[in-house]
């Protein structure tokens, strides 16, 4: 079992990382214009651009909210168990496990609280995501996300004459559509960090690769904590399982003999 100082390192990193992740997401989504152009922080190196991601790390496995929540809960249990089995002198490993816990909790919080409705448009059955804008009694005003010029707005309300059948009125235009149930809710993760690096246009690089983004994903602090923590953990596991060199045991015996 780890020493109390080890627990302190683990908890401080986990709580501090989680607080930084949630605060940075709150700041970005209240300061930056959603759906707008990126804010350049360091040209060609760092930009801020808000985006809702329905997948896991870097958008993998989009739309599986329930599966991600269950997997995240299991991962949290595994991380705490691994920490409890870690020797007290593995300080860097304590920090890495705390970072993994912070990242998992940060994205898990978003998936459980940041929800959009998944709704097919009447014309062409095109699937869009709509966010609740306001509520008045049983009626909900929904607007297409992300915000853009010409975004579709809906009014969702129950049909009093047909029980739990819902009516969606598209605004403007008054196009109506009946639904047997509410649109499906999907959990999202808030991302806002972008590294806008591209392949340079050097002569020896193939033409089709020049100008392509090296890092097309938008991510958040939780993603960075997860990647850093898992990287350190992988290095530790690899070092612990490396086979001993043939002469190392004999040398050790000679020194102790």
Regions found by a protein language model. Give the residues of each.
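Alpha-helical transmembrane bundles and membrane-interface segments of multipass inner-membrane proteins
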Residues: 1-257
């Amino acid at each position: 079992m780890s020493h109390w100082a080890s627990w302190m390192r683990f908890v401080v990193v986990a709580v501090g990382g989680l607080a930084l992740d949630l605060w940075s997401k709150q700041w970005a989504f209240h300061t930056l214009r959603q759906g707008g152009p990126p804010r350049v922080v360091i040209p060609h190196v760092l930009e801020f651009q808000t985006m809702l991601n329905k997948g896991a790390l870097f958008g993998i496995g989009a739309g599986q909210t329930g599966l991600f929540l269950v997997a995240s809960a299991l991962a949290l249990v595994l991380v705490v168990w691994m920490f409890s089995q870690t020797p007290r002198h593995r300080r860097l490993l304590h920090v890495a496990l705390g970072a993994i816990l912070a990242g998992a909790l940060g994205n898990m919080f978003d998936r459980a609280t940041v929800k959009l409705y998944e709704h097919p448009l009447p014309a062409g059955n095109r699937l869009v995501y709509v966010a609740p804008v306001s509520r008045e009694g049983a009626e909900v005003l929904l607007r297409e996300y992300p915000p853009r010029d010409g975004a579709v707005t809906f009014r969702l309300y129950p049909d009093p004459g047909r029980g739990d059948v819902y009516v969606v009125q598209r605004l403007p235009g008054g196009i109506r559509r009946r639904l047997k149930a509410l649109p499906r809710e999907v959990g999202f993760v808030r991302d806002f960090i972008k590294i806008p690096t591209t392949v340079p246009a050097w002569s020896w690089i193939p033409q089709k690769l020049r100008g392509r983004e090296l890092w097309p994903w938008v991510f958040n602090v939780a993603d960075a904590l997860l990647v850093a923590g898992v990287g350190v953990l992988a290095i530790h596991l690899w070092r612990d399982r490396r086979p001993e060199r043939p002469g190392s045991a004999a040398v050790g015996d000679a020194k102790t003999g």
